[in-house]
Amino acid sequence: MPAITLPDGSVRTFDGTVTGTTIAASIGPGLAKAAMAMEVDGKPVDIGTEISSDASVKFITRKDEDALEMIRHDAAHVLAEAVQSLWPETQVTIGPSIKDGFYYDFSREKPFTPEDFPAIEAKMREIVAANTPFVREVWDRDDAIRFFEEKGEDFKAQLIQDLPEDEQISIYRQGEWLDLCRGPHLRTTGDVGTAFKLMRVAGAYWRGDHRNPMLTRIYGTAWRDKKELDAHLLRLEEAEKRDHRRIGREMDLFHIQEEAVGQIFWHRKGWRLYTVLQDYMRRAQERNNYEEVRTPQLVDRALWEASGHWDKYRENMFIATVEDEDKTLALKPMNCPCHVQIFRHGLRSYRELPLRMAEFGACHRYEPSGALHGIMRVRGFTQDDAHIFCTDDQIADETAKFVKMLAEVYSDLGFDTFRVKFSDRPETRAGSDEVWDRAEGSLKKACEIAGVEYEYNPGEGAFYGPKLEFVLTDAIGRDWQCGTLQVDYVLPERLDASYIGEDSNRHRPVMLHRAILGSFERFIGILIEQYAGKFPLWLAPTQVVVASIVSDAADYANEVAATLKAAGLQVETDTRSDKINAKIREHSLARVPVILVVGRREAEERKVAMRRLGGAAQEILSLDDAVAALAKEAQAPDIARFAKD
């Protein structure tokens, strides 16, 4: 007689094994109609799953956020059936749900193109309208392999062969079509609804390995209703307008080319933006008593073996050999082992703790070419990386100080709110469970003391310790995980870091790994899209253009520019003979925040006509007033703040 506990705390008892369908019907016809799936003891399962013992049950309806992932998962199955209905020779591979949508990878001699989408979407709507039940079946392993091999589905057969011997072979059937899948699924294809759209195609190697066959990946998006779908498409349209790759070209900030895949050629204006941001971060770290260091980029494998990165991270490292010296080295993918070497260099005392060590460290990580994205996902990048060596008793205070610093930085850069995620131990990790218990407990206690509220992000910690992830929301509602704080007891032990305590004995420090921006490259990409290239004056690569109306005003334009430069502004002059409206249009497209227009009258009266980006009106100011106002506005927020103090 299973006792079923519902979310409101009420308990219903049933005579023998019961399904979610039966439980929902016992509560009422409305829920019986609306329930699409359920959670049993926190685990999502099919609505028809049998329950034979006491359990907590929560039903999932279309109104629930949890329904979205299942709608997208089922939409991937509907997509695969539609494709094979239209092109039976196509092999299906895998098709998961992802953020905002789903994809499915197909093997076909002729790759799909967006021109195929109307036919596929029409067939998908037919499958949804058929309202065919999803039925789970458990097959014998050998029978399943033989079935897919006989169908010519070699990829599916390979997937089954690679599954653990003790894993059930779960097959989901929707009418005559079926697929290998762990589930769970909704009740029927009709539960997917019609709020879906195919978005794009891309190439993808089977299992992400370039040595394997190239597949065609079809991406789609799916939502609970048309209103959500339309809102998402509107966000994508806005995101396209803000794409940092396009804006980067238009503003002449950077470029990437085939001879250096995944690495950035910073142009003058882009590098100016980079250095302004780096200088700002350097000042923030100095105010918070960080000592800046610099460590090598190319390091012997012995250090990576000792730290554990060689075992856990080698496939993402760029490795070099030195034949004459019989050495194997790697470009560092992160700075932490090198910072431990500095900490270990000489005898450390408890009086030096906490020791905050920062580096704008150049790192390299291998990313598949298909995963690269502008300057946001690259192979060569610079981290705003720091490591705090401290005692257990100092973790809470250091956490509070870091969060305060992070909040100030984000606010200065235009992000006033952020969320925090607590990521605990991953499946692949270094250190014993006892060490992880200690690390997770310390970080939770630190959050409690520091007043940091968080949501759980299970299994997503670093391989050496749990972490807090700080997630920004941008101007169009997208989330960006940037900052991190990680508690690490493992690396100091592995690399033999120690200090002399008050008792004159050696002790292991705790190592806090922390970053605020993450990488400069990615964060600059985020900033470009946050502001759509229309930066506040202090960040703008070119802050002011002085444009002359007539050639007679060229000398005065140069004088104005020189005066602004002397006040510390980044200024360009435009004394070409082009019409002033053409000049204004050109510099507005380049997203220059301020254009100062000067002609004969302005030269005679020593004034300027100031135009703001996006504004039609001009403000007439004396040269001295304009310089004073712009110099004040162009101050970085932290400098302006401390000037007031």
Swiss-Prot record:
It comes from the Bacteria. GO terms for molecular function: ATP binding; metal ion binding; threonine-tRNA ligase activity; tRNA binding. Residues 243-536 are annotated as: Catalytic. Its EC number is 6.1.1.3. The keyword tRNA-binding applies. Its cofactor is Zn(2+). Catalyzes the attachment of threonine to tRNA(Thr) in a two-step reaction: L-threonine is first activated by ATP to form Thr-AMP and then transferred to the acceptor end of tRNA(Thr). Also edits incorrectly charged L-seryl-tRNA(Thr). Zn(2+) binds at C336, H387, H513. It is found in: Cytoplasm. It catalyses: tRNA(Thr) + L-threonine + ATP = L-threonyl-tRNA(Thr) + AMP + diphosphate + H(+). Homodimer. Binds 1 zinc ion per subunit. The keyword Nucleotide-binding applies. Keywords: Aminoacyl-tRNA synthetase, ATP-binding, Cytoplasm, Ligase, Metal-binding, Nucleotide-binding, Protein biosynthesis, RNA-binding, tRNA-binding, Zinc. Belongs to the class-II aminoacyl-tRNA synthetase family. GO terms for biological process: threonyl-tRNA aminoacylation. This is Threonine--tRNA ligase.
